[in-house]
Amino acid sequence: MRTATITEFSSSYRSLPGLLHLLQFGDSALPIGGFSFSNGLESAIQQNLVHDKETLREFTLTAMNQAATSDRIALLTAHRAARADDRGALQVIDKAVFERKLNEETRLMTVRMGRKLCELSASIIDDRLNRDWLECIKTAETPGTHPVSLGLAFAALDVDGRDAFGAQQYGVATTILGAALRLMRVSFMDTQKILLEATSTVAPAYEEIADAGIEDMASFAPMVDILAAVHVKGHVRMFMN
């Protein structure tokens, strides 16, 4: 039986805290309000665009692709700016994210979750930049979007950009699939099968945008904006978007 060397144990222990931080801040149960949002699924079901496991699969993969080319680019650029302590760049990124949210509900979602996350980070992480960023949000110097707050938190915790990207793409999928279990007739087996396929798209998606700048951030999803507009006027709503 092979015995692990001291070097291997040391390497494992060095990486373990980062892994645990990733799990904590990538958890859908993190108390920042993510469970209140369905990423557009509720309206998609009400409009019969999603009605079975196959249309749910298509919706989930589309949402992940949209997130990869928009909020995830913001996450990575904010992560790099935070590591460089470039506060001017952080404000530019934050405003760019907010301006690209075309409807009321997605704007509400990103700033509400962003502020809650920054309040949490500033309270439990010993990092001056996170505390200063919270003050900027409170004084309305910056919108305080979720991707930027997350980039700051992961930078302070020394989680690398690739892992941060992966955690958040996983979060998009689990948010949608968790909402699906409450909104439509679909089994846990079905959602887990979709999740397994969805996670296989994360690494290729990262490679495509790893070096992207904020000017590359874009998404073309007119149906999502239409569904959000419909949802605002909905009379029966389980989720906030």
Swiss-Prot record:
It comes from the Bacteria. The keyword Chaperone applies. Gene3D superfamilies: Urease accessory protein UreF. Disulfide bonds: none annotated. Keywords: Chaperone, Cytoplasm, Nickel insertion. The keyword Cell inner membrane does not apply. It is found in: Cytoplasm. It holds the Pfam family UreF. One of its GO terms (cellular component) is cytoplasm. One of its GO terms (molecular function) is nickel cation binding. Transmembrane segments: none annotated. Its main location: cytoplasm. Belongs to the UreF family. UreD, UreF and UreG form a complex that acts as a GTP-hydrolysis-dependent molecular chaperone, activating the urease apoprotein by helping to assemble the nickel containing metallocenter of UreC. The UreE protein probably delivers the nickel. Required for maturation of urease via the functional incorporation of the urease nickel metallocenter. PANTHER family: UREASE ACCESSORY PROTEIN F (PTHR33620:SF1). This is Urease accessory protein UreF 1. The gene is ureF1.
